[in-house]
């Protein structure tokens, strides 16, 4: 399995993703510039956290127009795995690959800490090695991570099992239904505000995020 980590101007978690996949998981990973216009030869795509284009206008609002994004959209529509963390999640909502939106935290402050999550859905390429209902701890670091959707969409997400991760002990940003991560209807696109790539070694505090990437690599072995 060959994995692309997209690098936008202002990305700052691209290296974290690369290290989690390449150094810790021994995966075949390449950085791909936002200036490129194809993803030929790749089997999965990662959109990193950070502040793409300085978060001007709105988080992810300018990144959605990057030359690489039509290829990401086509990649996802072909059923291939696409993952976005933090700013990557915001970009995925901006381009319409994931429903809803991310707005400013209710506290109006940047929040940086480790939070407890509940795993709600293990039937995705990114969560198959977790157990449904399992509690895990992952870091967050964002100012605009409050998930919003209207009542009809929220009901649809819950009914379809599209909520993958939910804030457990506390809701750090005001996300509706305590939502921390969701998939599209097909289940091949996952966006989440927490950073699993920052929790892949005990040196970093815990390894609770490691199975996001190992699940993906196992998926690649099965389909490969």
Swiss-Prot record:
One term of GO molecular function: ATP binding
Compartments, record wording: Cytoplasm
The Glutamine amidotransferase type-1 domain, residue ranges: 2-224
Keyword Nucleotide-binding: yes
Main localization, broad class: cytoplasm
EC number(s) given by UniProt: 6.3.5.3, 3.5.1.2
Biological-process GO terms, alphabetical: 'de novo' IMP biosynthetic process
Highest taxon of the lineage: Bacteria
CDD domains, alphabetized: GATase1_FGAR_AT (cd01740)
Keyword rRNA-binding: no
SUPFAM superfamilies xrefs: Class I glutamine amidotransferase-like (SSF52317)
Associated pathway: Purine metabolism; IMP biosynthesis via de novo pathway; 5-amino-1-(5-phospho-D-ribosyl)imidazole from N(2)-formyl-N(1)-(5-phospho-D-ribosyl)glycinamide: step 1/2
Alphabetized InterPro entries for the sequence: Class_I_gatase-like, PRibForGlyAmidine_synth_PurQ
Location of the active site: 86, 195, 197
Catalytic reaction equation(s): N(2)-formyl-N(1)-(5-phospho-beta-D-ribosyl)glycinamide + L-glutamine + ATP + H2O = 2-formamido-N(1)-(5-O-phospho-beta-D-ribosyl)acetamidine + L-glutamate + ADP + phosphate + H(+); L-glutamine + H2O = L-glutamate + NH4(+)
Assembly: Part of the FGAM synthase complex composed of 1 PurL, 1 PurQ and 2 PurS subunits.
Protein's name according to its UniProt entry: Phosphoribosylformylglycinamidine synthase subunit PurQ
Source organism of the structure: Ligilactobacillus salivarius (strain UCC118) (Lactobacillus salivarius)
Lineage of the organism: Bacteria, Bacillati, Bacillota, Bacilli, Lactobacillales
The encoding gene: purQ
